[in-house]
UniProtKB/Swiss-Prot annotation:
Induction: Highly up-regulated during the early stages of invasion of the human blood-brain barrier. Disruption phenotype: Disruption of the gene reduces the ability of M.tuberculosis to bind to host cells. Disruption does not reduce virulence in a mouse model of infection. Invasion of the infant human brain microvascular endothelial-cell monolayer is significantly decreased in transposon mutant. This is Uncharacterized ABC transporter permease protein Rv0987. The complex is probably composed of two ATP-binding proteins (Rv0986) and two transmembrane proteins (Rv0987). It is a multi-pass membrane protein.
Amino acid sequence: MNDQAPVAYAPLWRTAWRRLRQRPFQYILLVLGIALGVAMIVAIDVSSNSAQRAFDLSAAAITGKSTHRLVSGPAGVDQQLYVDLRRHGYDFSAPVIEGYVLARGLGNRAMQFMGTDPFAESAFRSPLWSNQNIAELGGFLTRPNGVVLSRQVAQKYGLAVGDRIALQVKGAPTTVTLVGLLTPADEVSNQKLSDLIIADISTAQELFHMPGRLSHIDLIIKDEATATRIQQRLPAGVRMETSDTQRDTVKQMTDAFTVNLTALSLIALLVGIFLIYNTVTFNVVQRRPFFAILRCLGVTREQLFWLIMTESLVAGLIGTGLGLLIGIWLGEGLIGLVTQTINDFYFVINVRNVSVSAESLLKGLIIGIFAAMLATLPPAIEAMRTVPASTLRRSSLESKITKLMPWLWVAWFGLGSFGVLMLWLPGNNLVVAFVGLFSVLIALALIAPPLTRFVMLRLAPGLGRLLGPIGRMAPRNIVRSLSRTSIAIAALMMAVSLMVGVSISVGSFRQTLANWLEVTLKSDVYVSPPTLTSGRPSGNLPVDAVRNISKWPGVRDAVMARYSSVFAPDWGREVELMAVSGDISDGKRPYRWIDGNKDTLWPRFLAGKGVMLSEPMVSRQHLQMPPRPITLMTDSGPQTFPVLAVFSDYTSDQGVILMDRASYRAHWQDDDVTTMFLFLASGANSGALIDQLQAAFAGREDIVIQSTHSVREASMFIFDRSFTITIALQLVATVVAFIGVLSALMSLELDRAHELGVFRAIGMTTRQLWKLMFIETGLMGGMAGLMALPTGCILAWILVRIINVRSFGWTLQMHFESAHFLRALLVAVVAALAAGMYPAWRLGRMTIRTAIREE
């Protein structure tokens, strides 16, 4: 027989096709294992890319063709600068007011609001206006509170020119009039306009309370010389940045979030690899006598190798294709969860369309096929190296597994040490950390065979005394088929350990956050403007409300806070700043580092001696402890501020700078108040005070008055909602593991049909057969569950102490609950028992004569 390419050797392919028709269920399991793993990766990619594209489109609608823009502090840019630029011949400049509003008349959703000068727009955002005759939009310039929308949005909500639209701008209710409809030239422009309201610059200044100020000035600069000349004319506190700066900043904000989701989906794929390995191994083991006959007839080792590899390649292609389709479908469902999390923690975004990129599909295709080939390689090599005589012996593979035991311990030590080294390496590289995490997980999975053998051999005598011969047979059967059972146990262990690890890490985060909220938010009443999303307030409190509430009877102290973003030149990005008039924790705030005496910290802080940094800020900027003074761009130029302390904070993974309000007002000329924290006098009742304030401000939509307890509950609700995706990933990994156990038990059932047929022939009842199967599956599930507990704890420690710190900069306290461990054991045992029901049913219905007949 000639050694020819496997694809050209028709008889071998006919045997493979007959095998597929005889045992379709095994190949279905193989395809499912690949499909589910690929689906999760593609789903995460699709949902993340859709959110990123939605932001890119909304940013492009604002940015247009501008190459640079001039920006300043929280109060914006003085519009006189725009006038001066025009006077000096810089015609490629345009004023912009930009912000988010809650469009109550447009589905009660957050939308971008842009104020522009239509006469300066042609060079910047012409695609939005290309099909529009500005002369027909006279009301755009002359009508008070006149706005324009895309024709598609207006039709969706049944609006016509002249209709009024209710908005909430910076927390204050207002009404605008639709004075015109935009008809974009193409679909991309239409998508850009789907979440955009446009008004004249003067209308926007009035609505956003920015008289004489601009959010930024857009520029089109074609050479460096022009950029240099403009920069030389800029007043103190104004800077020039490229138009891509905001997009890059946003991408950096969400990178850690996306990487963490992708890593969790890879764990589901890792469980799928175990399933593929288990299924292919069984296919090889079951066909060993047939392969021996083929080898005797002259089929070469290489032909057997390529037959097995190509079978898996075909299954991998089918599974990957199915996984891509499922992933796109799941991605559509995950978009809402991903978008909500981004809205809660980062920025406002609305995703209208699913974005499926070629890169996402190619990534899923490569990963799926690579996973299938990687998992198939060991059994294919084993089949290739086995000589015909040993191939005919059923015990040869199991004897090899027994000889392999010491080497599995060596591999466990080597791979585990490599993983620990990767985790130990300093730096904030998440990819290195996840390589270490996966190395440790695979190392722990490698010891499943020796541990299973060790435990089962010691359980057999005890179970024999307790349950009789069947109790002794069950653990011994697991050991006799260790090449299949140990892989199924490892797959289930990986899935359940993911459940334990993520549950502990999420529980630790939740408990740490709850404790932090309890000690940090010590005020009795919280006053704020309404929010666009579940995140921080979008506007500021009315001046009259601040004045009246701070003097309200029963209020001992009113701490005022102002949230804003300022530019840090040394870090090249805007940072979040919170200016406060006092300590909202009433002296209970936890600190990571303090300069000097803690008792004098707040007196020094309120005297303007320095600022405080949150722990994530220190981590994100890789600052040394103690941190050096930081530089911030103020209205009068860059100013340096000493750092007095580093405090614990879980409100933002981007970091927060805490500054006293007096210093903030002096440097940025900003008297606005975003929120108020009210401390009541002794004997005052918070419920009664809230009722009084709500009655006094009844009918006003620009003030929200609630107890601090309600704020804590809302924070915990947002936290729980943000981890919904994680729970979904856990579920998929468990489903894949369930399929793996089912595959292993089906393999054992087919492989042991002759043996069990003999047992039935000598008197074993169907009831005893069911009992044997359930003891075996229960032992496998229990073993997987017991191994998953320490593995899950190790995974949780890595997630909490390393991955979390590198991703978000938060230090969390490990928190263990017995419920996590009990639930994991229950899931492992129940999954194994459930997977054993179908094989037990099949065995119970088998014909004894057929089962005991040898070929």
